[in-house]
Amino acid sequence: MSEQDGSPIRKYFLFPGATHVDAEECEITTVLGSCVAVCLWDQRHGGGGMNHFMLPLWNGEGLATPKYGSIAMERLLEQVLAIGARKEHLVAKVFGGANLLSTSSAACPIGERNIELAMTQLEEWRIAVVATDLGGRVGRKIIMNTMTGVVLLGRGKQQNQ
């Protein structure tokens, strides 16, 4: 229930390669493995959103979709600013980037590259990162409240090697 008026909170499931932003209260849920999700929230006025990207960089071929971190990060910031958030009031929370494959090649650590892209972009934008849960060998489920900025985190079980 919404703290403001007792009405049910709207819920949105964020699929990989997507972004969702809301100026009103909404709970955005996603599930992460090697993908990364960045939550941006306006700490002064509320409202915010989340992206969920699978690969770090778009190579210029095909569609420039938010499945690529370089696109997803730009889209998320543009959309959060479009709902009235102010860049100087934004804070970020970053999740995911796990290495779930036991045979994962050191030459292609997708999770690590996704984390690096997100953190570098936020640093360039001078947006403070106030919470992270990154890397490791377990998946995650996160639920972000766009009005309060609270993110609930659940972790999967560690797989035995």
Swiss-Prot record:
Keywords: Chemotaxis, Hydrolase. Coiled coil: none annotated. The keyword Hydrolase applies. Its EC number is 3.5.1.44. It catalyses: L-glutaminyl-[protein] + H2O = L-glutamyl-[protein] + NH4(+). GO terms for biological process: chemotaxis. Probably deamidates glutamine residues to glutamate on methyl-accepting chemotaxis receptors (MCPs), playing an important role in chemotaxis. PANTHER family: CHEMORECEPTOR GLUTAMINE DEAMIDASE CHED-RELATED. This is Probable chemoreceptor glutamine deamidase CheD. It comes from Trichlorobacter lovleyi (strain ATCC BAA-1151 / DSM 17278 / SZ).
